[in-house]
Each structure stands twice: as structure tokens, then as C-alpha cells.
């Protein structure tokens, strides 16, 4: 029996978020298994999975030969192989690309829609989950596995948990939290990812950016010491030759509409407006505030004013919860 997604409601900012249980249907799961799974994945993505323990997860990019990202992936070990979470809109394309050379390796690469992705965040999220599992992940142990469940811990913008689990456990968690937690869909998790400065690559922006343009180097998503992987030459060139001139920014403010992924924004230049950037994701919160994640030049002035194209509202830069200085 399939798990029924929760109905949508306007997302809240992390500062005002009550205990919330979310179905993450806009994200999707994929796996690689088999004797060559580690070697194969290591040759395809930007992060070093050979050093990944069972208690860790990491962000990585899967690039084309030009170093442009098909997708970014949240990778962790599961069931003797690896699993990763990415946006559902581009999973099929990403898996098609990943499988291109798999015929030469002993691996099985597959989408997995049998398992359920849940998010738990907001007021006293840890206390709410604690009675339901023997142990919860934390900063020292960001992944905990229990039976069919992988629990992933995230620090920003406030402590939150991502559960990869079977339908029975998802129903058990939902039944336990239904009375005290508000229910929501993927949009709330998306809003939290935007606040956290975690890049959201959907199909509209697949194949458009090198990893550094979305701050992956600052998020531990690129190893410059590992062996070859697809697109490595271009990714390395961006670092060592200073070829990357873009960065991911979080903006907040107001607008009469929510911009789509792939749109540009406008930057105020004196009395005029100039088109700039590419929107990765945007969400309107329950207080009317608009959050926008956008890739722009990495030398933007912190007091710059932006707007959704031809809109009366305005957007300003929000600080990221991590530094780009040494990235």
C-alpha cells in the first residue's frame, strides 16, 4: 500500500516553525549496489565516497564532461551499497546518465519509490522523534540506521531530520506525531533548504552550472584529492585557475508572484534595473515573505537590491550559514 502524501500548507520560516512532519514527494531516492558500487560511484561524482562511513552523509554533484551538473545528490551508505536523494524532476535523466558506463561494472543502479521520504523539523523535533527510535543522528553521527530506516541529521537552518523508511514505519511515525505536529508537504522542506543555503537543482537548471557556482566547495561537496570522475578537469580548472565567477545567494523580500526555476531577476542599478542571475528555487512563506535561491556573480554588494522581473516588490541578500571565504 502506498503512503499518502500530506496536504500542502504555506511554509513557515525556521524561526517560527512549529513541530512539523513533511512528506518529501518532490525529492526522490536512487540506489547503487553490487561489488563495484563504490568504485563506480567514485568515478562519477565530485565527492569522495571511499571515505564515507555508515554514519555520514554528504552532498555531491554528478556532472557532464564539461563539469556542468546533471544533479546534486545527498549520498549515504545503505544496505551494503549507496543511496542518494535528489529532486524528483531530474532523477530519471540523472540515472540515465549514470548508467551509461555501468555495463562494464558489476553494479545495479535503480530508482526506488518503495521507500518513503519524510522530514521532521521545527519546535522540539528531537524530543518528538526520540521515543520512536533507539537512537537519533546528531552532529557527531549524522546518519543512524535502524531496521528499514535511515535517519539523516541536518544542522541548518535549525536541527531537522530526514527519514528514509518503509511504509509501515512511515505510518507509525505519522500516527505517533499526528496529534502534536502539523503536517506539510515538500514546500516546507524546500523553504528550509533555501534558508540553509543548500542548492536545489531541478530539471530547469540541469546541465547549467558547475558545482562551485552553487557553493558545493563550501559545503564539502567536492574533493580535489580523489581520482578521476566525469567533468573533473573543468571543476578543477574552476578552482585552480579562478574560472568560477558565480555563487549561490539567498534573497528575501516581497513580490506579487513566486519566480520559477530558470528565471532571471533584476538588479537595481541607480534608477534602472538590469537582468541578473538564475533562480534555482523560490517559496512564499505564510507571513508573505518570499525566499529566493539564485545563482549570480560572486562579487555582489551585500546591500544590493533585487526584484522579480517587472515587479513592485524588492529582495535583499540574506547571510548564508557558512563561509565562502576559503572555499
Swiss-Prot record:
It comes from Klebsiella pneumoniae (strain 342). Its main location: cytoplasm. Pfam families: GCV_T, YgfZ_barrel. GO terms for cellular component: cytoplasm. Keywords: Cytoplasm, Folate-binding, tRNA processing. Folate binds at residues 27, 189. GO terms for molecular function: folic acid binding. Gene3D superfamilies: 2.40.30.160, 3.30.70.1630, Aminomethyltransferase beta-barrel domains (3.30.70.1400). InterPro entries: GCV_T_N, GcvT/YgfZ_C, tRNA-modifying_YgfZ, YgfZ/GcvT, YgfZ/GcvT_CS, YgfZ_barrel. The keyword rRNA-binding does not apply. The keyword tRNA processing applies. GO terms for biological process: iron-sulfur cluster assembly; RNA modification; tRNA processing. It is found in: Cytoplasm. Folate-binding protein involved in regulating the level of ATP-DnaA and in the modification of some tRNAs. It is probably a key factor in regulatory networks that act via tRNA modification, such as initiation of chromosomal replication. This is tRNA-modifying protein YgfZ. Belongs to the tRNA-modifying YgfZ family.
